[in-house]
Regions:
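Early extracytoplasmic/lumenal segment of secretory-pathway proteins
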Residues: 46-115
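Conserved C-terminal helix/tail region of periplasmic/extracytoplasmic solute-binding proteins
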Residues: 341-369
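Periplasmic-binding protein-like
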Residues: 153, 217-225, 263-287
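Mature extracytoplasmic/periplasmic domains
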Residues: 277, 286-346
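Extracytoplasmic ligand-binding site segments that recognize negatively charged/polar headgroups
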Residues: 62-65, 90, 103, 107-230, ...
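Bacterial lipoprotein signal-peptidase II cleavage site
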Residues: 35-44
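A ligand-binding cleft/hinge motif common to bilobed small-molecule-binding domains
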Residues: 113-117, 249-266
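N-terminal secretory signal peptides
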Residues: 1-15, 22-33
Length: 369
């Protein structure tokens, strides 16, 4: 992949993953039918009539290459994917409120799904209709009770191995060493308030999910104190700068690293000792749908090993069904940033309206400093 193609891929993925907290964009309309294979596991869900269209709120191309065609062949239902809205969680609530009954199911991060549930926009999820959900560890299903969790993302460090023989292995070390000759002016952070302030909280030893206003202010000040040594807060292109040596270390996303790692042996991944802030994304059934039985069939179909592996290979996301690892492409299966077993300290961030407002104010202060 060329450098500019890598940067473009990172930008679109970066925006998508913030479904879980603030933003999302882009989509395509897809209605396909084609060839596929049958499965006893898929037929386990009952009650769906054959034929019709399921309408999904989804990010562009966030689907296995063959999933839609194979499901259409087996069940007669096509999947129409409509665009996720700009404007954050409020836009999601407004879109689904004004179009109740139009959509059958949606992609949503754990924080977005929680807000949809609070606004009575989700159908009650019946896990008994998705037998393949048993393949997903309870760690994930308990964090995402609104539907089926599909994948996860996490934030760690990636660094240039040539420049740093002993890189920081924690947020505390990163902040403490920011002014050193090895790191000063060569540190990259995401241009996103939550990720930056989470880093500050972790560096201070705080729990990002129970932070008080005073702790958020401390985190703000900690970030401001190292800002002179930060090269940039950027949306995309961090791995390219790590590889070419213009930056030494970045706080960044596992999927960015997964794209970049096959391109260079000079880039390495670190799961910080405090843990990796993460998020779950999944599919949720929507209130007002007249096709919930078919929705459950598609949920179950998605979690079959071959279909789920197709999804992970296409999206290069971190998987949550351990058994599919042997079916994944080598660049995905062997990526230490994506492998859940190599990142056991991942935890999932929770946001509410008050915390979101506090983060926004703190981020503005960081930008103004």
């Amino acid at each position: 992949m060329k450098t500019n193609e890598l940067a473009n891929a990172q930008l679109t993925r970066r925006t998508f993953f913030k479904l879980s907290a603030v933003t999302a964009f882009g989509a395509t309309i897809v209605g396909l039918a084609g060839c596929g294979s049958s499965s006893a596991a898929s037929s386990a869900t009952a009650g769906s009539s054959s034929g019709g269209t399921l309408t999904m709120l989804n990010y562009a191309d966030w689907m296995g290459v063959d999933e839609v065609e194979n499901f259409a062949k087996q069940y007669g239902f096509t999947i129409e994917e409509l665009p996720t809205p700009d404007g954050g969680t409020t836009a999601w609530v407004n879109t689904l409120t004004s179009n109740k009954g139009t959509y059958d199911f949606a992609l949503a991060g754990n924080n977005v799904a929680k807000r949809l549930k609070e606004n009575n926009l989700l159908a009650d999820f019946d896990a008994s209709k998705v037998p393949n959900l048993s393949k997903v560890a309870s760690t994930y299903t308990s964090e995402f009770p609104y539907g089926i969790p599909c994948e996860q993302g996490k934030i760690g460090f990636y660094y240039n191995k040539r420049l740093l023989s002993t890189p920081p292995t924690s947020y505390k070390e990163l902040f403490a060493q920011a002014s050193s000759d090895a790191l000063a002016g060569k540190i990259l952070f995401p241009a996103y308030d939550g990720d930056v302030l989470d880093a500050g909280l972790l560096a201070l030893g705080y729990d990002v999910n129970s932070a008080t206003a005073a702790q958020i202010e401390e985190a703000r000040d900690a970030v401001i104190s190292i800002k002179p040594y930060v090269k940039a807060f950027i949306d995309s292109g961090a791995p390219s700068q790590i590889i070419d040596g213009s930056a030494a270390i970045a706080v960044g996303y596992d999927y960015d690293y997964a794209y970049a790692a096959p391109e260079s042996e000079d880039i390495g991944w670190i799961a910080p000792s405090e843990g990796c802030p993460g998020y779950l994304d999944g599919w949720v059934p929507l209130a007002g749908s007249k096709n919930l039985d078919a929705v459950y069939q598609f949920f179950n179909f998605h979690l079959e090993d071959e279909n789920y592996a197709d999804f992970i290979n296409t999206t290069m996301a971190s998987w949550i069904i351990p058994e599919v690892k042997s079916l994944l492409d080598p660049d995905v299966a062997n990526c230490e940033a994506l492998d859940p077993e190599k990142n056991p300290g991942t935890f999932y961030t929770q946001n509410d309206a008050d915390k979101t407002a506090q983060y926004a104010a703190a981020w503005q202060a960081i930008q103004n400093a």
